Amino acid sequence: MTKVITRFAPSPTGMLHVGNIRVALLNWLYAKKHNGQFILRFDDTDLERSKQEYKDAIKDDLKFLNLHWDQTFNQLSRLSRYDEIKNLLLDKKRLYACYETPDELELKRKFQLSKGLPPMYDRASLNLTEEQTEKYIEQGRNPHYRFLVNHEPISWHDMIKGEIQYDGKALSDPIVIRADGSMTYMLCSVIDDIDYDITHIIRGEDHVSNTAIQIQMFEALNNTPTTFGHLSLIINKDEKISKRVGGFEITTLRKEIGIEAMAIASFFSLLGSSAQILPYKSMEKLINQFEISSFSKSPTIYQPKDLERLNHKLLISLDFDEVKDHLKEIDAEYIDENFWLSIRPNLQKLRDVKDWWEICHHTPNVESLNLDQEYLKQAAELLPQGAITKDSWSIWTKEITNITGRKGKELFLPLRLALTGRESGPEIADVLPLISREEIVKRLTSA
């Protein structure tokens, strides 16, 4: 049996977003499910936009998610190989030179659209005479090169969508070499997939038409096309996710919002499948449950709040032994097991544990806040008798309202400030049981 080899091929022109990472996850999981290999390739032939800082950030995000690669390379390191294939395809008459300027191509596109026609290249350059070609060269025009798509049916069995068919006549010949000599994604990708023995490619359904063309490229190079699977796109409020949608970058999720690696991995590896989205604690467990056949053909809706809820479920499921190393990573190694077990049900983000510790173990200095001391002392006297529980807050505030007439912010904010020293933070109903009765009274009467 052929060894399974998958790849993830980001362009280092920006940070990874949730759509990218879903593709990376599924390719990694598919490879590991079949005891195969996962290759990281950087499609960095766009010299103007590709940056080393993005390569470093992409690697950092993948490592954070435990998506370790077996091999990595950059397309820029393979330019001589691409030139070799370019010459081969020129000899086979599957590449041809074109001399239109970007402005001329844009005029053609607008004209076709004005006639209600799809914007397809008209193959005018195939009919250039030697004299016309020489004239363009004398004008200083550098040619770009297109791949000649055969006008015949193209079909393949997609791992997710099933049987797919295209008419080659409906596909425009793509530019594969720019006028400056740099290569575009289309042909380079096929050359790499052949040379690195890629067996399976899972990517977004916005690549389906590219796949149809690339199948002909495989065949033009006398190779059997790899097996493809096309995922439905992730959408948020009827828009597909892209690099330019703020708030959906992986670095934002992990560094600014504080989502755990396994919450991200669990969520996006199950999103769009028939499997229930659960907070898995390890990549091994995700591998065991992974089935590419479970993914739907329908668009996949991403709601950020769903990811945050899954993050909460993951945190409350973690025993102290499972989280103590993570606590060290956020400089919270002082958290002990008893405190973790007490505070765990209230956590939305792991970093919140530091706020809870500070609130529960340090009497806040609120002298500068000029709080209404008479009101706070009255509130202390109305504190319910007996053990402090989560129900104590609602009982207490109802009694305060009955006696003082205070409601809303006028009631809540002075109590929060006196008890925590902060205008916002964890729910006071959750904080109270973690502070002794004596400490609550002390904070209220000394404010």
UniProtKB/Swiss-Prot annotation:
> GO CC terms on record?
cytoplasm
The entry's localization annotation reads: Cytoplasm
Could you identify this protein by its name? Glutamate--tRNA ligase 1
Any idea which GO molecular function terms this record carries? ATP binding; glutamate-tRNA ligase activity; tRNA binding
Record key words, sorted: Aminoacyl-tRNA synthetase, ATP-binding, Cytoplasm, Ligase, Nucleotide-binding, Protein biosynthesis
Main location, first listed in the record: cytoplasm
Motif 'HIGH' region: chain residues: 10-20
Pfam family example for this protein? Anticodon_2
- Positions occupied by motif 'KMSKS' region: 240-244
Q: Which InterPro entries match?
A: aa-tRNA-synth_I_cd-bd, aa-tRNA-synth_I_codon-bd_sub2, aa-tRNA-synth_I_CS, aa_tRNA-synth_I_cd-bd_sf, Glu-tRNA-ligase_bac/mito, Glu/Gln-tRNA-synth, Glu/Gln-tRNA-synth_Ib_cat-dom, GluQ/Sye
Q: What does this protein's UniProt record list under function?
A: Catalyzes the attachment of glutamate to tRNA(Glu) in a two-step reaction: glutamate is first activated by ATP to form Glu-AMP and then transferred to the acceptor end of tRNA(Glu).
The record's annotation in NCBIfam families points to: gltX_bact
Q: EC number(s) per UniProt?
A: 6.1.1.17
Superkingdom of origin: Bacteria
* Subunit organization: Monomer.
Q: Which family does it belong to?
A: Belongs to the class-I aminoacyl-tRNA synthetase family. Glutamate--tRNA ligase type 1 subfamily.
**Binding of ATP: at which residues?**
K243
Name of the top EC class for this enzyme: ligase
Q: Which Gene3D superfamilies match?
A: 1.10.10.350, HUPs (3.40.50.620)
Example GO biological process term?
glutamyl-tRNA aminoacylation
Reactions catalysed, as given in the entry: tRNA(Glu) + L-glutamate + ATP = L-glutamyl-tRNA(Glu) + AMP + diphosphate
